[in-house]
A protein has these predicted regions:
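Extracytoplasmic ligand-binding site segments that recognize negatively charged/polar headgroups
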Residues: 44-52, 72, 76, 88-228
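Short, polar/charged alpha-helical segment
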Residues: 46-68, 79, 242-243
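A ligand-binding cleft/hinge motif common to bilobed small-molecule-binding domains
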Residues: 99-103, 225, 230-250, 301
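A bilobed periplasmic-binding-protein/Venus flytrap-type ligand-binding module shared by bacterial periplasmic
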Residues: 144-151, 187-190, 263-277, 296-299
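Conserved C-terminal helix/tail region of periplasmic/extracytoplasmic solute-binding proteins
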Residues: 328-354
Length: 354
């Protein structure tokens, strides 16, 4: 999710890609039988990643496989998948949060058993599901605490301090029903505090203290720069990206309260997609994790989602990221929290957002 923009639902089938698909469909031999090229079908990618358009274009250029990209926030994409579960319209999903994939996996909606032949680092190995139903592509952290250094001389040092009167009406965050990284953050807080009921109590107190909620990272950061809030709790990539580069605010700084939650981004394949499309989805995953694909990930959204921690050996994070060793992190079990996502988001929207 990029820093200061709200995603719009974009269906991309670029002219070159569409023409390629038409040309391939028209490739037949003299006896009317399709040639090998006609085996290429359109791969439908649902994605909430800032570098997805660049990746789709690079993948098509490298393979000739036509791709239709539906770029949107995670919440709406998951709603689309649920609405079309009996007649799926997607082939590959790429969003942040292993909890979302665990939930889909437990519903039987993801292809199992595929793992690309790559050299995982520790983050990658830790993020792999046992049944190989999704593939990690990177890691960010939730939530980073972003603040204006000129207005906040002494930022909070613990999550509990956000409940104090000092920060009444000054804390902003995202809506988990819209923002993919936000449910894992909420689940992480519940995990840290000891359970769902303890987490609900915490967020109820935070709301009573004037919590302000916007849909996604971009609007929440805009609330910070406009002065509506003094503290913004967002995904680390968005927080770091707000501090440098074009359109950034040099007065902003990022702090990590203990603990923050590891947030894997991942790719999952629709179990009900045609075989040809699933095979193309596997090729897409392999390309993303190739040296060429990693270059696209690290350049396609340099002030947003490119600010991730790699999951592959031999790939270093961009220099703007702090050493992960300097941050206290926790990992939540996606198969524990994923099935709870719908219920927790419903509770959050009914009791905290409204």
């Amino acid at each position: 999710m990029t820093r200061f923009t709200t995603r719009t639902n974009v269906r991309i089938l670029a002219g070159a890609l569409a023409l390629g698909a038409i040309a391939l469909a028209g490739c037949t031999s003299a006896n009317g039988a399709p040639t090998s090229g006609s085996a290429k079908v359109t791969l439908v990618v649902y994605s909430a990643q800032g570098y997805d358009s660049a990746m789709v274009k690079a993948f098509h250029k490298a393979t000739g496989i036509p791709v239709s990209l539906d770029d949107n926030s995670t919440g709406p994409l998951l709603t689309q998948i649920e609405a079309s579960r009996n007649n799926p319209k997607w082939g590959l999903l790429w969003v942040d949060g292993a909890t979302a994939f665990a939930g889909l996996d437990q519903q039987g909606l993801l292809q199992k058993g595929f793992e690309p032949k790559v050299s995982w680092n520790t983050l990658g190995t830790q993020s792999l599901p046992a049944d190989k139903s999704y593939t990690p592509t990177g890691v960010t952290l939730v939530a980073a605490l972003v603040y204006n250094k000129t207005k906040v001389a002494s930022p909070p040092t613990t999550w509990q301090q956000l409940l104090s009167s000092q920060w009444k009406g000054d804390v902003g965050m995202n809506d988990p029903s819209q923002s993919g990284p936000t449910f894992p953050f909420i689940a992480g807080m519940m995990n840290y505090l000891g359970g769902v009921s303890q987490g609900e109590a915490y967020y109820s107190k935070l709301k009573a203290n004037g919590l302000i909620i916007h849909p996604t990272n971009g609007p929440t950061l805009q609330a910070l720069t406009s002065g509506q809030v003094k503290l913004a709790r967002v995904q680390s990539s968005a927080g770091i990206g707000s501090t440098f580069g074009p359109g950034s605010d040099p007065k902003l700084a990022v702090k990590y309260l203990n603990p923050v939650t590891i947030l894997p981004s991942a790719l999952g394949i629709d179990a009900k997609a045609p075989l040809a499309e699933r095979q193309e989805a596997e090729k897409f995953i392999e390309y993303v994790l190739s040296p060429a694909g990693q270059k696209v990930m690290q350049t396609g959204d340099p002030y947003g989602d490119s600010l991730y921690y790699p999951v592959l050996q031999g790939v270093s994070p961009l220099p703007e990221l702090p050493s992960l060793a300097s941050v206290t992190t926790q990992t939540i079990n996606p198969y524990t929290w994923g099935p709870r996502e719908a219920a927790i988001n419903t509770w959050f929207d009914a009791n905290i957002v409204r």
